[in-house]
Amino acid sequence: MKARLPDSPLDWLVSKFAREVPGVAHALLVSVDGLPVAASEHLPRERADQLAAVTSGLASLAGGAAQLFDGGQVLQSVVEMQNGYLLLMQVGDGSALAALAATGCDIGQIGYEMAILVERVGGVVQSCRR
Protein backbone atom coordinates (compact mmCIF):
# COMPACT_ATOMS: atom_id res chain seq x y z
CA MET A 1 0.00 0.00 0.00
CA LYS A 2 1.32 3.41 -0.92
CA ALA A 3 0.98 6.32 1.48
CA ARG A 4 -1.32 9.15 0.46
CA LEU A 5 -1.28 12.81 1.33
CA PRO A 6 -3.48 13.75 4.27
CA ASP A 7 -6.95 14.72 3.02
CA SER A 8 -7.17 18.33 1.94
CA PRO A 9 -10.41 20.21 1.31
CA LEU A 10 -9.15 20.69 -2.24
CA ASP A 11 -8.36 17.01 -2.94
CA TRP A 12 -11.80 16.35 -4.37
CA LEU A 13 -11.50 19.25 -6.85
CA VAL A 14 -8.05 18.16 -8.01
CA SER A 15 -9.17 14.51 -8.21
CA LYS A 16 -12.29 15.47 -10.17
CA PHE A 17 -10.13 17.44 -12.61
CA ALA A 18 -7.77 14.47 -13.17
CA ARG A 19 -10.67 12.03 -13.47
CA GLU A 20 -12.82 14.08 -15.86
CA VAL A 21 -10.35 15.80 -18.19
CA PRO A 22 -9.36 13.40 -20.99
CA GLY A 23 -5.65 12.58 -21.07
CA VAL A 24 -4.84 13.77 -17.53
CA ALA A 25 -3.25 11.05 -15.40
CA HIS A 26 -2.45 13.05 -12.26
CA ALA A 27 -2.81 16.56 -10.90
CA LEU A 28 -1.24 18.31 -7.94
CA LEU A 29 -1.66 21.68 -6.27
CA VAL A 30 1.68 22.88 -4.88
CA SER A 31 2.16 25.64 -2.30
CA VAL A 32 4.41 28.63 -2.90
CA ASP A 33 7.07 26.94 -0.74
CA GLY A 34 7.01 23.72 -2.79
CA LEU A 35 4.83 21.49 -0.62
CA PRO A 36 1.92 19.40 -1.92
CA VAL A 37 -1.42 20.98 -0.95
CA ALA A 38 -3.85 18.69 -2.79
CA ALA A 39 -3.38 15.70 -5.04
CA SER A 40 -5.46 13.59 -7.38
CA GLU A 41 -6.64 10.36 -5.82
CA HIS A 42 -4.21 7.90 -7.45
CA LEU A 43 -1.01 9.90 -6.93
CA PRO A 44 1.08 8.21 -4.19
CA ARG A 45 2.58 10.41 -1.47
CA GLU A 46 6.18 9.83 -2.57
CA ARG A 47 5.36 10.80 -6.16
CA ALA A 48 3.36 13.82 -4.96
CA ASP A 49 6.39 15.02 -3.00
CA GLN A 50 8.65 14.53 -6.04
CA LEU A 51 6.21 16.23 -8.41
CA ALA A 52 5.84 19.12 -5.96
CA ALA A 53 9.60 19.64 -5.93
CA VAL A 54 9.79 19.51 -9.73
CA THR A 55 6.82 21.87 -10.06
CA SER A 56 8.28 24.36 -7.62
CA GLY A 57 11.65 24.32 -9.35
CA LEU A 58 10.22 24.72 -12.85
CA ALA A 59 7.86 27.49 -11.74
CA SER A 60 10.78 29.31 -10.14
CA LEU A 61 12.96 28.95 -13.24
CA ALA A 62 10.17 30.12 -15.53
CA GLY A 63 9.49 33.09 -13.26
CA GLY A 64 13.18 33.97 -13.21
CA ALA A 65 13.38 33.84 -17.01
CA ALA A 66 10.27 35.99 -17.35
CA GLN A 67 11.68 38.55 -14.94
CA LEU A 68 15.10 38.57 -16.60
CA PHE A 69 13.64 39.15 -20.05
CA ASP A 70 10.75 41.44 -19.05
CA GLY A 71 8.21 38.79 -19.97
CA GLY A 72 5.68 39.67 -17.31
CA GLN A 73 3.97 37.05 -15.19
CA VAL A 74 4.31 33.41 -16.27
CA LEU A 75 0.82 32.17 -17.09
CA GLN A 76 1.63 28.55 -17.84
CA SER A 77 4.51 26.25 -18.67
CA VAL A 78 4.44 23.09 -20.76
CA VAL A 79 7.13 20.44 -20.70
CA GLU A 80 6.81 18.05 -23.63
CA MET A 81 8.35 14.67 -22.88
CA GLN A 82 8.61 11.60 -25.07
CA ASN A 83 5.80 9.87 -23.15
CA GLY A 84 3.61 12.78 -22.11
CA TYR A 85 3.35 16.35 -20.89
CA LEU A 86 3.81 18.23 -17.66
CA LEU A 87 1.65 21.35 -17.59
CA LEU A 88 2.05 24.02 -14.92
CA MET A 89 -0.20 26.96 -14.18
CA GLN A 90 0.31 29.57 -11.49
CA VAL A 91 -2.37 30.17 -8.87
CA GLY A 92 -2.76 33.77 -7.69
CA ASP A 93 -0.78 33.47 -4.46
CA GLY A 94 2.31 31.92 -6.07
CA SER A 95 1.11 28.35 -5.69
CA ALA A 96 1.01 26.19 -8.81
CA LEU A 97 -1.21 23.56 -10.36
CA ALA A 98 0.60 20.72 -12.13
CA ALA A 99 -0.95 18.16 -14.46
CA LEU A 100 0.66 15.09 -15.98
CA ALA A 101 -0.95 14.18 -19.29
CA ALA A 102 -0.65 11.56 -22.02
CA THR A 103 1.01 12.22 -25.38
CA GLY A 104 -2.21 12.02 -27.40
CA CYS A 105 -4.03 14.56 -25.24
CA ASP A 106 -5.43 17.91 -26.29
CA ILE A 107 -3.13 20.24 -24.31
CA GLY A 108 -5.24 23.23 -25.31
CA GLN A 109 -8.28 21.67 -23.66
CA ILE A 110 -6.24 20.69 -20.60
CA GLY A 111 -4.90 24.24 -20.33
CA TYR A 112 -8.46 25.59 -20.52
CA GLU A 113 -9.67 23.19 -17.82
CA MET A 114 -6.65 24.06 -15.67
CA ALA A 115 -7.49 27.76 -15.94
CA ILE A 116 -11.03 27.05 -14.73
CA LEU A 117 -9.71 25.01 -11.81
CA VAL A 118 -7.16 27.70 -10.92
CA GLU A 119 -9.99 30.24 -10.75
CA ARG A 120 -11.95 27.94 -8.44
CA VAL A 121 -9.10 27.11 -6.06
CA GLY A 122 -7.32 30.48 -6.13
CA GLY A 123 -9.54 32.14 -3.55
CA VAL A 124 -9.55 29.09 -1.31
CA VAL A 125 -5.76 28.79 -1.35
CA GLN A 126 -5.33 32.49 -0.57
CA SER A 127 -7.81 32.39 2.31
CA CYS A 128 -6.10 29.30 3.76
CA ARG A 129 -2.78 31.20 3.95
CA ARG A 130 -4.24 34.00 6.10
Curated annotation (Swiss-Prot):
Keyword match Secreted: yes
Entry keyword Secreted: yes
Recorded superkingdom: Bacteria
Keywords from the UniProt entry: Host cytoplasm, Protease inhibitor, Secreted, Serine protease inhibitor, Virulence
Pfam families from the UniProt entry: Robl_LC7 (PF03259)
Annotated compartments: Secreted; Host cytoplasm
Principal subcellular localisation of the protein: secreted
Induction and repression of expression: Component of the signal transduction operon Rv3361c-Rv3365c that is highly up-regulated during M.tuberculosis infection of macrophages.
GO molecular function annotations of the record: serine-type endopeptidase inhibitor activity
Record's GO cellular component terms: cytosol; extracellular region; host cell cytoplasm
Complexes and interactors: Interacts with human cathepsin G protein.
Role summary: Effector protein that binds to the host serine protease cathepsin G on the macrophage cell membrane, inhibiting its enzymatic activity and the downstream activation of caspase-1-dependent apoptosis. Thus prevents macrophage pyroptosis and helps M.tuberculosis survival within host cells.
Recorded family membership: Belongs to the mycobacterial serine protease inhibitor Rv3364c family.
Protein name: Serine protease inhibitor Rv3364c
